[in-house]
Amino acid sequence: MLTPAFDLSQDPDFLTIAIRVPYARVSEFDVYFEGSDFKFYAKPYFLRLTLPGRIVENGSEQGSYDADKGIFTIRLPKETPGQHFEGLNMLTALLAPRKSRTAKPLVEEIGASEIPEEVVDDEEFDWEIEQTPCEEVSESALNPQCHYGFGNLRSGVLQRLQDELSDVIDIKDPDFTPAAERRQKRLAAELAKFDPDHYLADFFEDEAIEQILKYNPWWTDKYSKMMAFLEKSQEQENHATLVSFSEEEKYQLRKFVNKSYLLDKRACRQVCYSLIDILLAYCYETRVTEGEKNVESAWNIRKLSPTLCWFETWTNVHDIMVSFGRRVLCYPLYRHFKLVMKAYRDTIKILQLGKSAVLKCLLDIHKIFQENDPAYILNDLYISDYCVWIQKVKSKKLAALAEALKEVSLTKAQLGLELEELEAAALLVQEEETALKAAHSVSGQQTLCSSSEASDSEDSDSSVSSGNEDSGSDSEQDELKDSPSETVSSLQGPFLEESSAFLIVDGGVRRNTAIQESDASQGKPLASSWPLGVSGPLIEELGEQLKTTVQVSEPKGTTAVNRSNIQERDGCQTPNN
């Protein structure tokens, strides 16, 4: 038989059950309901429900079938009109539990149906058994195997799975490691894993952290609606309607096996504490991935939850918060104390929304682990049982759990990682670096100013020196201008008077044309011109005298040049006509 997909809804007077049977023979179907029992059969589908309230057959019941969708819709009247049926979306809890048919259970549930007498063990007790003196034995000897799993109900399961579990849990040999030893090893591993550089990097460069903190997961909107509803009405029974399940989630619920859990007071408290621990890890994962699951999601959840990673047992809520805070700052990519507190507030919101919101989170965790190999083992140990158990928990218990979590306060000093000292030292170093950079910038500006002043002084010095050089060059030019006249005047001494018919120009000799013109104007005959290359006796005599005069009057270093010039001019120059 197949269990069909179904959905329940209600109004003040009727309970509506919608059953999807696309491949059923609609010509043959049976419906039975009485009190809290409901049964439906249409080959090959069979559905049996245990309702949270009583229904009655009074002639007002209705039924219809949608052939296009393949859905039977049945409306059944409530025995007490106006009664609210709680937990109609807890599909697994509505499915009738399976009953044992063969052997008597080792632990019986109070109120369960009696076991037939024929299955009772009638074997007689052996009175001749060998007797030994009574000796007090330690608890560890009485329980050689350590317990873990949902409510610490499992033991001896993981002995043959050590190789497969090495990537899932951090504890080695969980079947032989007591709870106290697990905690000691966990604390030591966390302390060794803590990286101050990684923490400080996220502490100072927190742009990505601030973006993550702004993300609003699905429960934020639901929580806001719930608070707005509470302001208008004090009724709390309709909170479950705020959270709905998808078809995929409903399919998950139908696949779970409905069963009862016999938990004593201590085990029940342990289950509630571990639920907080798992929800904290889930809230962190949902926030940092912004609801988009990835290949690291399963690792994040199980790594941040000591319940899943170390099979940790808890005695109070504060220890859960301390452990979660330490692991957030040691293992994941984003390590910031603000993320710890944000996950803490998100968990409170989920618990206050009720078991529908908690169940939705557990179903998501179950799906993540189921798609990850070998993390699916954690579903068998914890999550599947949580998904069934939470559907039967009273809402008041979750509300009390939320209040207990709200009363917890967590500080950085309580994490035992010396975060405040580390931050203070880092801030001090940062201030010193800032002051050092400021000093360097001031000194650099001073150096720049001094260099500019030096360049200005150099420019002024160069201008002064250039002025001096210009004046020196002008004086030298004046001297050079005066020196030719002195040379000429010295040459004109006794040999060439001012009225001489010959002049010495640029080291050469030419005829004084001015005198010739004056002589011509006075009626004096002009001197005849000699042909080029012919030297008269006067020219030769003057040439000899000029050589002697130049050698005596010109300074050293210029004698050879002037002599060569005079020789050249003496040999080639002729008087002008």
Swiss-Prot record:
User: What PANTHER family does the database record attribute to this sequence?
Assistant: PROTEIN SHQ1 HOMOLOG
InterPro entries, per the entry? CS_dom (IPR007052), HSP20-like_chaperone (IPR008978), Shq1 (IPR039742), SHQ1-like_CS (IPR048696), Shq1_C (IPR007009)
What does the entry give for GO biological process?
Answer: box H/ACA snoRNP assembly; positive regulation of TORC1 signaling; protein-RNA complex assembly; regulation of androgen receptor signaling pathway; telomerase RNA localization to Cajal body
What is the annotated localization of this protein?
A: Cytoplasm, Cytosol; Nucleus, Nucleoplasm
Q: What is the effect of changing E292K?
A: In NEDDS; results in decreased H/ACA small nucleolar ribonucleoproteins production when expressed in a heterologous system
**Which proteins does it associate with, and in what oligomeric form?**
Directly interacts with DKC1 alone, but not in the context of the core trimer composed of DKC1, NOP10 and NHP2, nor in the presence of NAF1. Does not interact with NAF1.
Specify the superkingdom: Eukaryota
The primary site where this protein sits is cytoplasm
Entry keywords, A to Z: Cytoplasm, Disease variant, Dystonia, Intellectual disability, Nucleus
Positions of the CS domain = 1-89
- What clinical condition does the entry mention? Dystonia 35, childhood-onset: A form of dystonia, a disorder defined by the presence of sustained involuntary muscle contraction, often leading to abnormal postures. DYT35 is an autosomal recessive form characterized by the onset of a dystonic movement disorder in the first year of life. Neurodevelopmental disorder with dystonia and seizures: An autosomal recessive disorder characterized by global developmental delay, inability to walk or speak, profoundly impaired intellectual development, and early-onset dystonia. Additional features may include other extrapyramidal movements, seizures or seizure-like activity, and cerebellar hypoplasia on brain imaging.
Identify the stretch(es) annotated as Disordered.
447-492, 549-577
Annotated consequence of substituting A426V:
In NEDDS; uncertain significance
Keyword Zinc assigned to the entry: answer is no
Quote the function comment for this protein: Required for the quantitative accumulation of H/ACA ribonucleoproteins (RNPs), including telomerase, probably through the stabilization of DKC1, from the time of its synthesis until its association with NOP10, NHP2, and NAF1 at the nascent H/ACA RNA.
User: What are the GO cellular component annotations?
Assistant: cytoplasm; cytosol; nucleoplasm
Family, as annotated: Belongs to the SHQ1 family.
| PROSITE patterns in UniProt | CS
Protein name, per record: Protein SHQ1 homolog
Keyword presence, Nucleus: yes
